[in-house]
Amino acid sequence: MKDILLDVRGLRTAFHTEAGAWPAVDGVDLVVRRGEIVGLVGESGSGKSVTGFSLLGLIDPPGEVVEGEIRFKGKDLRKLGEEQMRQLRGNRIAMIFQDPLMTLNPVLRIGEQMAEAILTHENVPRAQAMERCREALETVGIPSPDKRLRSFPHEFSGGMRQRVAIAIAMLNKPDLIICDEPTTALDVTIQGQILYRMQEICRQHDTALIWITHDLGVVAELADRVAVMYAGRIVESGPVDAVLDAPRHPYTRGLLESMPAQTQPGARLRQIDGMAPTLSARRGEVL
């Protein structure tokens, strides 16, 4: 069994308002090993993305990580200063966002942006950095990488922009990549290509992956293990085949049963009864 890379214990993230603190993430425990792909699954509002942002220290006011440990390679990230976290982000831990335009500056050429991701963390000649950028674009399947380094983001399709975002995340060979629904807005064909590339890259470099999604089909295809989130908590986790083939928690069963593939043609789609609790309904003693 591979070494533990990320060990999260009792993570709680709250958003402060005049009425008090409201828990978006409420006691999350999560372990990720080197080279492992973990799917973090749940419906909108379950706390998936807030968990991902919390791990990287990217929660802005009025949000705050109020409790828990986030141990990366044995070091508690919550005890690091902002400069130490800045050196970690994009270097040892990278993140890929749902919208690649959150990663890419529209007025800078792709090559400039990619080279900056290297030069921020390493003192290498610019020509060497650009060669690594070219190789990264080639790795994610972008044709004519030399030409594309001189292109602007608007000259790429949505799928190609997402490939660029993946290439940027891989530039410094991080130990962990957090992916926040990076294929949600893409068509099925492009989604399949990107999933294949991500699996290939992770296996080659022994990179661990946290794949945040609401799509159980993607998790079944991509992940080694899955953690199911509901109302800010992980309610079930385990090897992906075990959880999807024999779910033990009612919410996990409800998610699986509501998939179109589980419904006969012409039959009414099944849905989970009731509604997920709001922040106010699940408010606890978070401070």
Predicted region positions:
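A short, proline-enriched helix->beta-strand linker immediately N-terminal to the Walker B motif
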Residues: 171-175
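Conserved ABC ATPase "signature" region
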Residues: 76, 128-147, 256-257
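Conserved ABC ATPase signature
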Residues: 151-156, 160
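Conserved ABC transporter NBD signature motif
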Residues: 65-76
